[in-house]
């Protein structure tokens, strides 16, 4: 399928080798995009991989999707840089941000999101999500997005969810900060709220998040590093605790 300039939704996907499962988890996501009721969709893939596995997979395009593949050598290993690159290359009216290992839970997910956003003056949006430990064979812990002012103040108050619940209108200029990892989502949410107002908080489960027992970001970042990230965000945004 050819890319064109009439995309309603762009799905921005930063990818890497993902511990040897990069193609496998990306395939799950693309499969769920291929069965969406909304068809005017492009998938923008920004690839931090060193090998060619994902590029070769995208070239096959087995689901016949509008795929825009970009090999990204800048800031390799930094999720913010890779995500921003995917967003910056999107052409759709609405940009749906997606972590590589997550996937759509509802075949009408993109259509619901697009309709709600285009009928609202709000510039950004978060939906509900559900979790899986076994690659979608079973699900648990539905989560619905809610705003909490302590989100940017202290760890443990992100009641919106991870970045895969996020969608923005194309005119939104907020981007992810390359200087943070644990605060990547809450820093973006706070900045977007300051610049664009409250998001649409859509209490419908549209996204499935994979939960990994090992190799998680939380195991890679110490509590001290997390607290330092929050201090950095406070200084950046002029927040006094």
Task: Show which residues each predicted segment covers.
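C-terminal, non-catalytic tails of nucleotide-sugar-dependent glycosyltransferases
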Residues: 1, 216, 222-241
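Conserved nucleotide-sugar donor-binding catalytic segment
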Residues: 12-13, 146-226
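Acidic donor-diphosphate engagement hotspot in glycosyltransferases and nucleotidyltransferases
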Residues: 25, 54, 106-112, 136, ...
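Acidic donor-binding segment of Leloir-type glycosyltransferases
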Residues: 30-74
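Glycine-rich, basic loop-to-helix element that forms the pyrophosphate-binding segment
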Residues: 73-90
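Short beta-strand-to-loop acidic/aromatic patch adjacent to the donor-nucleotide binding site
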Residues: 92-103
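Conserved donor NDP-sugar-binding/catalytic core segment of glycosyltransferases
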Residues: 108-139
């Amino acid at each position: 399928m050819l890319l064109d300039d009439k995309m309603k939704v762009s799905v921005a996907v930063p990818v890497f080798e993902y511990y040897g499962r990069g193609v496998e988890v990306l395939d799950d996501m693309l499969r769920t995009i291929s069965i969406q009721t909304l068809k005017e969709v492009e998938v923008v893939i920004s690839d931090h991989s060193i090998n060619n596995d994902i590029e070769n997979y995208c070239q096959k395009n087995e689901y016949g999707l509008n795929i825009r593949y970009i090999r990204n050598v800048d800031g390799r290993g930094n999720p913010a840089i890779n995500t921003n690159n995917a967003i910056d290359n999107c052409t759709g009216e609405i940009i749906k941000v997606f972590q590589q290992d997550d996937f759509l839970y509802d075949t009408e997910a993109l259509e619901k999101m697009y309709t709600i956003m285009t009928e609202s003056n709000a510039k950004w949006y978060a939906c509900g999500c559900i979790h899986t430990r076994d690659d979608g064979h079973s699900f648990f812990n539905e989560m619905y997005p809610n705003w909490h002012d302590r989100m940017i103040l202290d760890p443990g108050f992100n009641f919106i969810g991870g970045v895969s619940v996020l969608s923005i209108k194309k005119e939104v200029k907020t981007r992810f900060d390359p200087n943070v990892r644990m605060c990547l989502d809450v820093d973006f949410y706070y900045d977007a709220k300051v610049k664009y107002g409250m998001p649409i908080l859509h209490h419908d489960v549209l996204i499935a998040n994979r939960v990994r027992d090992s190799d998680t970001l939380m195991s890679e970042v110490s509590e001290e590093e997390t607290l330092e990230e929050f201090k950095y965000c406070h200084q950046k945004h002029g927040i006094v605790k």
